[in-house]
């Protein structure tokens, strides 16, 4: 009788241990992971959802703020079910290698789920850029207005002095030009066409 009772206890303990093994580990729903990109952008990835999960990434750095969202069903990947934390750590390691956490990739892939179906991949579904804060906008507008004023002053300085055009001396009709005209007339009347200039020169020379 004692042996039967002991055997019964062993079976119950074994079933309890089996139940603990079959019980899935705690999921990463609601977890936040902080990381930096290759260009030192400070980013936060927030994970939510149950079967279909969503990962929202928000980053700030180098005067810009941007965000993007990914959705997928990583539960279809069996290694994810056993260790979801390692899955997200692998994805974060890949994001750290990128200069831009949202523009550089359309899918989030973990090496532990390379053989998983396509639906298990986290695909980008939305992305955007946040506007600059008020201080940065004011500074940029002040710089723009200052540059416009500077350009206006420089244009006024350049166009302030009127351009001075050179004076054109009037053509003087002297005695020499009249002699040349008469000499050419005589040359045309008394010389061959090919000798007009020569005859005009000789006639002008003798007419003085």
UniProtKB/Swiss-Prot annotation:
Annotated region Disordered: the residues are 130-181
- According to the UniProt record, which cysteines are disulfide-bonded? 43-59, 68-102, 77-113, 191-199
What's one Pfam family here? FGF-BP1
Location in the cell reads: Secreted, Extracellular space
Task: Keywords in alphabetical order, please.
Answer: Disulfide bond, Growth factor binding, Secreted, Signal
Q: Which GO BP terms, alphabetically?
A: cell-cell signaling
Task: Give the residue range of the signal peptide.
Answer: 1-19
Keyword Disulfide bond carried by entry: yes
Which superkingdom is the protein from? Eukaryota
The text of the family note is: Belongs to the fibroblast growth factor-binding protein family.
Q: What is this protein called?
A: Fibroblast growth factor-binding protein 2
Lineage, opening ranks? Eukaryota, Metazoa, Chordata, Craniata, Vertebrata
């Amino acid at each position: 009788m004692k042996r039967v009772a002991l055997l019964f206890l062993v079976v119950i303990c074994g079933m309890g241990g089996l139940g603990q093994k079959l019980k899935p580990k705690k999921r990463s729903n609601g977890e936040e992971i902080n990381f930096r990109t290759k260009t030192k952008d400070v980013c936060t990835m927030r994970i939510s959802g149950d079967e279909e999960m969503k990962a929202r990434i928000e980053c700030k750095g180098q005067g810009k703020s941007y965000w993007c969202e990914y959705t997928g069903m990583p539960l279809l990947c069996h290694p994810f079910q056993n260790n979801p934390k390692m899955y997200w750590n692998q994805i974060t390691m890949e994001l750290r290698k990128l200069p831009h956490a949202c523009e550089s990739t359309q899918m989030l892939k973990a090496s532990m789920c390379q053989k998983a179906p396509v639906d298990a991949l986290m695909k980008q579904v939305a992305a955007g850029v946040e506007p600059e804060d008020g201080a940065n906008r004011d500074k940029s507008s002040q710089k723009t207005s200052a540059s416009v004023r500077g350009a206006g002053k420089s244009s006024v300085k350049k166009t302030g002095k009127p351009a001075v055009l050179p004076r054109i001396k009037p053509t003087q009709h002297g005695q020499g030009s009249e002699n040349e005209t008469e000499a050419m007339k005589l040359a045309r009347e008394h010389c061959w066409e090919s000798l007009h200039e020569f005859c005009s020169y000789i006639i002008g020379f003798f007419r003085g």
